Design a protein with these regions (language model features):
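Catalytic core of pol beta-like nucleotidyltransferases
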Residues: 1-24, 32-38, 48-104
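Short beta-strand->loop micro-motif that forms the acidic, two-metal-ion catalytic signature
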Residues: 43-47
């Protein structure tokens, strides 16, 4: 991960971690593999107990509110700890993200 990208995603994670009690944040995809293009998006999994009772789409919208001042796109996946545990068993992309991603 380049220094500029590193600071952007770490700044973002720091802000949402404080607001939503994020207990797991994983950068995955091309940014984590270091095979991204200049304008590639940031794929990130965020896990928080504070997401309970919030619709999945609303969680994502809330993350965009934190990201909107950065010039690049983000693709957040926001789960409760229980959802994350279940998705880890059900979805290959989540397993791959955990295996190949960078926990921040």
């Amino acid at each position: 991960m380049g220094k500029e990208a590193d600071s952007k995603i770490r700044d973002f994670i720091g802000k949402v971690r404080k607001k939503y009690n994020i207990n797991k944040a994983i950068l995955f995809g091309s940014r984590a593999r270091l095979d991204h293009f200049k304008n590639s998006d940031y794929d990130v999994i965020l896990v928080s107990p504070n997401f309970r009772g919030i619709f999945f789409s609303e969680r994502i919208a809330k993350m965009y509110d934190f990201w909107n001042h950065y010039p690049l796109e983000i693709e957040p996946l926001c789960y409760t700890p229980e959802e994350f545990k279940r998705k880890l068993k059900e979805h290959g992309i989540i397993r791959q993200a955990v295996r190949e991603g960078i926990e921040i």
